[in-house]
C-alpha cells in the first residue's frame, strides 16, 4: 500500500533531482529547474541550508571523494566542500538532458564535442583532472561502420544513435574481469534512437619496463583506456530511452511509450498502464515501482496520483489538474547501516527518528509544482 507519510515544501520550481547522502541517511539533497539545491534534515523534515548552485536545471547529484558533485543544464559540473563552497568547476556539454555517471574516481559524460558520444575523466583527490577517453563513438563500436536501416522507414538510413538520453552503471558478477582492468560494472547508455548499449571500461595498469640491467633504470608505460562492447538492444527503437534502472543487477529500461523492458536473457517486455515512463525505481531488489509523466505512480496493482483542486468533471479536465511527476527515488533500508550502536549522535538521531516515526524504506516523488511527497511502501 502506498500511503502519504509527509510532504517537503520549499522549492518554487519543478523538482529536478533528489539525492540521499550515502554517508548520513537522514541528510537529503533536492534540486530544482532553477538550479537551487536544498539540504534537508529528514529527522525534523526542515531545510538546513539552500544555495543557488547552478543557473539552470540540475540533472545529476552524486558524490566523489566524499564531496558533493552536481551537474546542470548550464553546462557545468561542480564539486562542493562541506561548507558548500565550490572547489572545482568543470565545463561540460549539456545540450541534451542526459545525466552523468560517477564510479569511484571516474566521471563519464556526454562528449564535449558531440552529444552522441562519450568522454571519460579521472579526478584525483587533489582535484586534478585527466581525460582518459575523448569523443568516443558508441555507434561505430556497435556497428563497425555499417549503416542501419531505421525501423519504420522506407529506404532511409542513419549513421548514429542520436543524442545520449540516459546512462546507468550496474555492478555485475558476469563481467569479464582481468588483472588488466579489474572492472566489475557495466555502463549502460540509452539513446534518442531507442538503442541501448552496454559498455565495459578497460583501464590497463601502467607497465614498468627495465631498459638496462640496472633495476633503478625503469620506464613507465601508460596504456590507453578503452571501451569493450558487452550488450546492445534495439527493442525500444524508434522511441527515445528516457529512464534506466536496476533490478537485481539486471537492466530495466523505459521509453516515451508504455513499454518497459527487463534486459534478462531472454528479455521480458512489459506493457504498462500509461505512456511516458518518467522513472523506474527498484524496491528490495526484486520489485519495481513506476512513475509516469502524467503524475501516476504504479506499484503492482496499486496506482495513485496527486490531484490539484478539481474544477471540471471530464477526463480531459481532470488530467490537466493532475500534478506532473518530475523525479522519483527510493530511500532503502540499507542506507540505515551508518546508524550503528546507539551512542552519541547516532543515539540522538535514533531518538528523533522514533519521535517522527521515520521508517525506511520510503518512496520520494518530486512534482512540477516543487513539492516532494514521501510515501510509505
Curated annotation (Swiss-Prot):
Chain positions of WD repeats: 10-50, 53-90, 230-262, 263-303, 342-377
Localization: Nucleus
Predominant localisation class: nucleus
Role played: Component of the ASTRA complex involved in chromatin remodeling.
Top-level taxon of the source organism: Eukaryota
Protein family per UniProt: Belongs to the WD repeat ASA1 family.
Complex formation: Component of the ASTRA chromatin remodeling machinery complex.
Pfam family, one: WD40
The organism of origin for this protein: Candida albicans (strain SC5314 / ATCC MYA-2876) (Yeast)
Cellular component terms per the entry's GO annotation: nucleus
Keywords assigned by UniProt, alphabetized: Chromatin regulator, Nucleus, Repeat, WD repeat
UniProt-listed GO biological process terms: chromatin organization
Protein name in the entry: ASTRA-associated protein 1
